[in-house]
C-alpha cells in the first residue's frame, strides 16, 4: 500500500513540513497554489509557429533551447555593430632606419633599411645565402709535376680557373667571357674537360690513404655527340619528320601483327593439345572395363564430362532439372559457330534435338564438342594457308623488284609488259614507303587483302594521272 511519502513523490510535493511531517496529506499540499504560480513565473516566453510554416523550417529559425554551434567559426557576439580592432596590450616594438653592409660584396658598399631596434648590430640576415663554389687552388710545383699539358699553357689554365671562381662554374658564361684573342679558341666541352681533369688530378694527389675518393668525371666525347645529335634532330626537314612518323606507325603495326600472330599460334596449340587429350581420354575409356553400378550411384556421377570444344553447364547442385537442359549450348558459343554446328549435324544426318536419354545426352554433347573443335581447327588451317600464300606472293614480288639483294628478275606473268625487266630512271627510285619489308606478316583475314588491293589500285591510278 502506498504511503504518504510515495504520494508526495508522485505529486512532486515538498519535504515533510507541517502536516506532511506527521505522515498525513492535507488539501493544501495537494492543491499547492503557490507552486503553480512559481511554475508559471519560471516559464520562458515562447513564440507560436506561424500558420503555413512547416515545423522543420520553424525549428531551423527558432528553438526553445540554445542554438547549435555553427559549422564554421564566426564572431556573432558583436551583432550588427562595427567590430573594433582587437589590439594587444603590449607596447609597439620600435623600428629604426639603420645602415648595413652585404658580406657578399667586397667593395664595402653601405646600404640602409628599416629594422627593429632590438636587432641593431646583428649580421645581415641574407648573408647566409652567399654560397660560393670551392674551386681548387694549385701551386707552381703541383702544376709542373702533375698538371702540365702541351695543349694548355700555364697562363691559359690560370685564366680558366679565375673565370671559374668569378662565375661559379657557369661554363656558358665562362665561354662567353673567355679571352679568345689572347688564347686559343676553345669550346665549352674543352673548358669543362680541362677543368675537371685538373680537379681529378689534384684529388688523387692530395688524397689521404684509406679514404673514399669522389673524383669528378666529365666525358667530353659523349657531350659532343649528344649536342651533335640534338643539332641534327633540331635541323630536320618537314619531310624527314613525316617519314619518321610514318616509320613509327609502321613499327607499331608490325608489333601489333606480331602479337596477334603469337596469340593465334597459342590458340592453335591449345586446340591441337585439346584434340590430342580428348582422343587419348576416349581410347582409355574404351579400353577400361565397364562395371554395372546400382541406379543410385549411376545418378551421382557428373551429368556432363568436361570436353575440349564446349564446356556445358553442370546442374549438379541446381535441384530438379530437365535432362534436355543439359543439351543446351552455353552462351559462350557464338552464333556463327552455332550455325556452322547445325549445318555439320545436318550433313551427318543427326537430329538437332534428339531424345534426351542419359546416354544420348552424353554422346550428343561429345559429338558437338568434337565438331566445334574440328571447325576451329579448319579455321586455323585456312588462316595459316592464307598467310603462307600471301607471304609467298610478297616474296616473289620483292624478288622481282630486287629488294632482297639479288638482281631484279623479270616477271613470269603473261603479257608483253611482264616480259620486260623493270627499268627505273635515274633519280626516280622506288618510294621508301613501298619497299618496307614486313617480316611479321599482315592480319590473317581476307578483308585486309581486299583493302591492300584497293589501296594499291588507287595509288597506281594516282601515278597514272601525274603528267
UniProtKB/Swiss-Prot annotation:
Q: Where is the composition biased (Basic and acidic residues)?
A: 1-11, 26-48, 258-267
Give the UniProt entry's GO cellular component terms: cytoplasm; cytosol; NuA4 histone acetyltransferase complex; nucleoplasm; nucleosome; nucleus; replication fork; Swr1 complex
Which spans does this entry mark as compositional bias, Low complexity? 406-422
Q: Domain of life of the organism in this record?
A: Eukaryota
SANT domain: from which residue to which, for each copy?
149-199
A Gene Ontology biological process in which this protein takes part is: positive regulation of DNA-templated transcription
Quote the CDD domains the UniProt record gives. SANT_DMAP1_like
> Which residue stretches belong to region Disordered?
1-48, 258-305, 404-467
Residues modified as Phosphothreonine: 445
Q: Enumerate the GO terms in the molecular function aspect.
A: RNA polymerase II-specific DNA-binding transcription factor binding; transcription corepressor activity
Q: Where is this cross-link: Glycyl lysine isopeptide (Lys-Gly) (interchain with G-Cter in SUMO2)?
A: 27, 214
Matching entries from InterPro entries are given as: DAMP1_SANT-like (IPR032563), DMAP1 (IPR008468), Swc4/Dmap1 (IPR027109)
UniProt keywords, alphabetically: Activator, Chromatin regulator, Coiled coil, Cytoplasm, Growth regulation, Isopeptide bond, Nucleus, Phosphoprotein, Repressor, Transcription, Transcription regulation, Ubl conjugation
UniProt entry tagged with the keyword Ubl conjugation: yes
Q: Which segments of the protein form a coiled coil according to its record?
A: 225-275
Query: Which Pfam families does the record cross-reference, listed alphabetically?
Result: DMAP1 (PF05499), SANT_DAMP1_like (PF16282)
Q: Which residues, renumbered to this chain, carry the PTM Phosphoserine?
A: 448
Q: Where does it reside?
A: Nucleus; Cytoplasm
Q: Quote the function comment for this protein.
A: Involved in transcription repression and activation. Its interaction with HDAC2 may provide a mechanism for histone deacetylation in heterochromatin following replication of DNA at late firing origins. Can also repress transcription independently of histone deacetylase activity. May specifically potentiate DAXX-mediated repression of glucocorticoid receptor-dependent transcription. Component of the NuA4 histone acetyltransferase (HAT) complex which is involved in transcriptional activation of select genes principally by acetylation of nucleosomal histones H4 and H2A.
Self-association state and partner proteins as the record states? Component of the NuA4 histone acetyltransferase complex which contains the catalytic subunit KAT5/TIP60 and the subunits EP400, TRRAP/PAF400, BRD8/SMAP, EPC1, DMAP1/DNMAP1, RUVBL1/TIP49, RUVBL2, ING3, actin, ACTL6A/BAF53A, MORF4L1/MRG15, MORF4L2/MRGX, MRGBP, YEATS4/GAS41, VPS72/YL1 and MEAF6. Component of a NuA4-related complex which contains EP400, TRRAP/PAF400, SRCAP, BRD8/SMAP, EPC1, DMAP1/DNMAP1, RUVBL1/TIP49, RUVBL2, actin, ACTL6A/BAF53A, VPS72 and YEATS4/GAS41. DMAP1 also forms a complex with DNMT1 and HDAC2.
Xref: PANTHER family: DNA METHYLTRANSFERASE 1-ASSOCIATED PROTEIN 1, DNA METHYLTRANSFERASE 1-ASSOCIATED PROTEIN 1 FAMILY MEMBER
Q: What is this protein called?
A: DNA methyltransferase 1-associated protein 1
Q: Which organism is this entry from?
A: Homo sapiens
Amino acid at each position: 500500500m502506498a504511503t504518504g511519502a510515495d504520494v508526495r513523490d508522485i505529486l512532486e510535493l515538498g519535504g515533510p513540513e507541517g502536516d506532511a511531517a506527521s505522515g498525513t496529506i492535507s488539501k493544501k499540499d495537494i492543491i499547492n497554489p503557490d507552486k503553480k504560480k512559481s511554475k508559471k513565473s519560471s516559464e520562458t516566453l515562447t513564440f507560436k509557429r506561424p500558420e503555413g510554416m512547416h515545423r522543420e523550417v520553424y525549428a531551423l529559425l527558432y528553438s526553445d533551447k540554445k542554438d547549435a554551434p555553427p559549422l564554421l567559426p564566426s564572431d556573432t557576439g558583436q551583432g550588427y555593430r562595427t567590430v573594433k580592432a582587437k589590439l594587444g596590450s603590449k607596447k609597439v616594438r620600435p623600428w629604426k632606419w639603420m645602415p648595413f653592409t652585404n658580406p657578399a660584396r667586397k667593395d664595402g658598399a653601405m646600404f640602409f633599411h628599416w629594422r627593429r631596434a632590438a636587432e641593431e648590430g646583428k649580421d645581415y640576415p641574407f648573408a647566409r645565402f652567399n654560397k660560393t663554389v670551392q674551386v681548387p687552388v694549385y701551386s707552381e710545383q703541383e702544376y709542373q709535376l702533375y698538371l702540365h699539358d702541351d695543349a694548355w699553357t700555364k697562363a691559359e689554365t690560370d685564366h680558366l680557373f679565375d673565370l671559374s671562381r668569378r662565375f661559379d662554374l657557369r661554363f656558358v658564361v665562362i665561354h662567353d667571357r673567355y679571352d679568345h684573342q689572347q688564347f686559343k679558341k676553345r669550346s665549352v666541352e674543352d673548358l669543362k674537360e680541362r677543368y675537371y681533369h685538373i680537379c681529378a688530378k689534384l684529388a688523387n694527389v692530395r688524397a689521404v690513404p684509406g679514404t673514399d675518393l669522389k673524383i669528378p668525371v666529365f666525358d667530353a666525347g659523349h657531350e659532343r655527340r649528344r649536342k651533335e645529335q640534338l643539332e641534327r634532330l633540331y635541323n630536320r626537314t618537314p619531310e624527314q619528320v613525316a617519314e619518321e612518323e610514318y616509320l613509327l606507325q609502321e613499327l607499331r603495326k608490325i608489333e601489333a601483327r606480331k602479337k596477334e600472330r603469337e596469340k593465334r599460334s597459342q590458340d592453335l596449340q591449345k586446340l591441337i593439345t585439346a584434340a590430342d587429350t580428348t582422343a587419348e581420354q576416349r581410347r582409355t575409356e574404351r579400353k577400361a572395363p565397364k562395371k554395372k553400378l546400382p541406379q543410385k550411384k549411376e545418378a551421382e556421377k557428373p551429368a556432363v564430362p568436361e570436353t575440349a570444344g564446349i564446356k556445358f553447364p553442370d546442374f549438379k547442385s541446381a535441384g530438379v532439372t530437365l535432362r534436355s537442359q543439359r543439351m543446351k549450348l552455353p552462351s559462350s558459343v557464338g552464333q556463327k559457330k552455332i550455325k556452322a554446328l547445325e549445318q555439320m549435324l545436318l550433313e551427318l544426318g543427326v537430329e538437332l534435338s534428339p531424345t534426351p536419354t542419359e546416354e544420348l545426352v552424353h554422346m550428343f554433347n561429345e559429338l558437338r564438342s568434337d565438331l566445334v573443335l574440328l571447325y576451329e581447327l579448319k579455321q586455323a588451317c585456312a588462316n595459316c594457308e592464307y598467310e603462307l600464300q600471301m607471304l609467298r606472293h610478297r616474296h616473289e614480288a620483292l624478288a622481282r623488284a630486287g629488294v632482297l639483294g639479288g638482281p631484279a628478275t623479270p616477271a613470269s606473268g603473261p603479257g608483253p609488259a611482264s616480259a620486260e625487266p623493270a627499268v627505273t630512271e635515274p633519280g626516280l627510285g622506288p618510294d621508301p614507303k613501298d619497299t618496307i619489308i614486313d617480316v611479321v606478316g599482315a592480319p590473317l583475314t581476307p578483308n585486309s587483302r581486299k583493302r591492300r588491293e584497293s589501296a594499291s589500285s588507287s595509288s597506281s591510278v594516282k601515278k597514272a594521272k601525274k603528267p
